[in-house]
Amino acid sequence: MAVWKIRIVCFPQKWKQFLNLLPNASQKSSASLRLANQWAASGKFALHYGPAALLREREKSVKSGCEDRRAKNQGSIQPPARKNSPAQKNGIRKSKTSRWRAAVLIFVQLCMVAHIIQWRFMGKTISPIEPSETMQTLQGGAINAGFIFFAVAILATLIFGRFVCGWGCHILALQDFCAWMLKKIGLTPKPFRSRLLVYVPLGAALYMFVWPTAARFFSSSGPGPLIPKFTNHLVTNNFWQTFPSVPVAIPFLIICGFVTVYFLGSKGFCTYACPYGGFFGLADKLAPFRIRVTDACNQCGHCTATCTSNVLVHAEVKAYKMVVDPGCMKCMDCVSVCPNDALYVGFGKPAIAVSKSSGKTRNYSVTWPEEILGAAVFLGSLLSVRGVYGLVPFLMALGYASVTTFLTLKTWRLLRASELSFYRFNLTSSGRIQKAGWGFLGFSIFWVGLNAHSGWVRYHEFEGDRAFQRIQIPDELALAQTNPDPWLSPIDRENILEGEKHFQRASNFGLFMNSEALSKLAWFEYLSGDAEQSVELLSQAAEHQKGQARALSLYYRGTILNRLGRYEQARTSLDEALAQRGDLILARQEKGESLWQLGRKEEAIAVWIDAVQRNASLALTNNLLAGAEQSLGRFVEGTAHENQADQSTPDVPLYHWMLGMRLKALGMNELAEKHFHRAIQLDPGYQERPK
């Protein structure tokens, strides 16, 4: 007959095992069992009973603070978990830190909402505290709150690691919330581990923040100085100017929050798409403040199981005595759940000072051939969706491309593997695709197909834009008369045909309207002689635009209406343009022409005077004022404006000819003939040009 023993051990929360064995007792020794149960009920001890041989084996195998799972099922009596140390069903206690971090992240979200509400009510506020605003500083010299925040965050990361990411990022909060919801329905996100795609965030960061300055450095004709003149933009009245519209922001948050987490694992966007994390990851390698380990660690793995940053904590602390993965966002869950208090945060040597020669071996989700295929798919997907329809921002495109890469590689395996699963669903079994597999395949085809369609549309948008950029005729000359055809070069005619073809294909087969491409198509229509169609397209574009883009579409619409003789409609369109951008001086110049043609000459002169007061070097406006004053018999004022015009008019035959045509259209014939004559003096070939 087997001898039974009763043993009392402390809970894992005590980080120490009591190996006291009670005196031998028979299986039916109710007195001993009752005494042991009383001790166990106190919450300080766990009671295990069973054959003595099993307990001896268990005693050898159980590590300090970690309960052997085999013995749990051999008659273990588990007392209630203590309130100050809750335990989950899997034996890992809940993190105390997670609630504090959740509270901080919720507070960050509330601050963002309050920031927006304050701007809506007051009309002015602190500029967005968003790292992407740093691009405005580096390219235009605008010192804003986003630049200051990003700079301080990088400096803090250099010392303390990626605490800003783990405790202050609103996108990370969304991802953690989505991961929490998935776990609530029994789906634990599994990390997708890639060797190459982890470098995407750094590449994106260099593209956003370094490439523009590098391009100016290596380009002799780059736009502006290498280091711009810095100006104060800490306060703004257009808070949402650099953000996508709400209809775009919603799918952006869905893709970068839920979709990336579902397919790529917890914090999937941070790992494979976030450009700010590219810089934070580099800074983290230099940070001396890290998660470290003492000799009390017994490799139980609770830390890794709890980590939401997909860090193999138990392996890293074993190999390096600290966490060196730059993906660690210092959520501190691993420290909180460690049953032995073996993990702590403290100062010491940084990760960059650790030799990796004897380090851990990582398991990846894909093979090297699949890595190369995935990198190609990612690049193609990114180029396909970024900026398509003029809607998709860079960060959203990065998230979309990451998911496309995963789906492509998973589909490749689905079609080749005999056994494949995703979460708890079997995609293939015994070489046959299961129902879940067909569902996954259908979604993958839809997602990748949408990506391919976006790539087709984006190609035509890109080629149409290239043709637009190659147009050589100046706007002033093209708009000097209703039909610009006589002034078009053979290259311009070729580019007009190419541009029209590509933009029309993108428009006809696209799912959404690209208002920017529509404006360019309108310009092609005008140059090809269809001014009425151009006006219609500009009206459609303006309905879907805001700010400067809307102002420009309305300006060109009003200008073309002036050439068509529809002056009242032109004036209305130009007033709408000025309502969007009061500093659009060319719109004031054109509005003056509308008023002049409507017979409201004094109003026209007042508008032109307002324009030259804003910019005294406007050659055409000064010429218009000179002609207007002279036509009304005010020769002194007219001569003054004419002299000012002569000082700012380029002595180029083409420009003089353009001025002559504009003045002649307004009935200012004497001044017009002066410029025609000067153009012929500079180039006798202009005698054959139509006036």
List the predicted regions and their residue ranges.
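Non-ligating segments of multi-cofactor redox enzymes
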Residues: F11, F18, Y49-G50, L54, ...
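Membrane-interface segments at or immediately adjacent to transmembrane helices
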Residues: A452-E525, D530-E536, Q540-E543, Q569
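Helix-start (N-cap) detector for alpha-helical repeat units in TPR-like alpha-solenoids
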Residues: V457, N514-E516, Q548-L552, I585-L586, ...
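Hydrophobic/aromatic packing residues within the alpha-helices of TPR/SEL1-like helical repeat arrays
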Residues: I496, F503-Q504, L538, L574, ...
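Short coil turns that delineate tetratricopeptide repeat
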Residues: L511-F512, K546-Q548, G582, A616, ...
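Register position in tetratricopeptide repeats
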Residues: L527, R563, Q597-L598, S631, ...
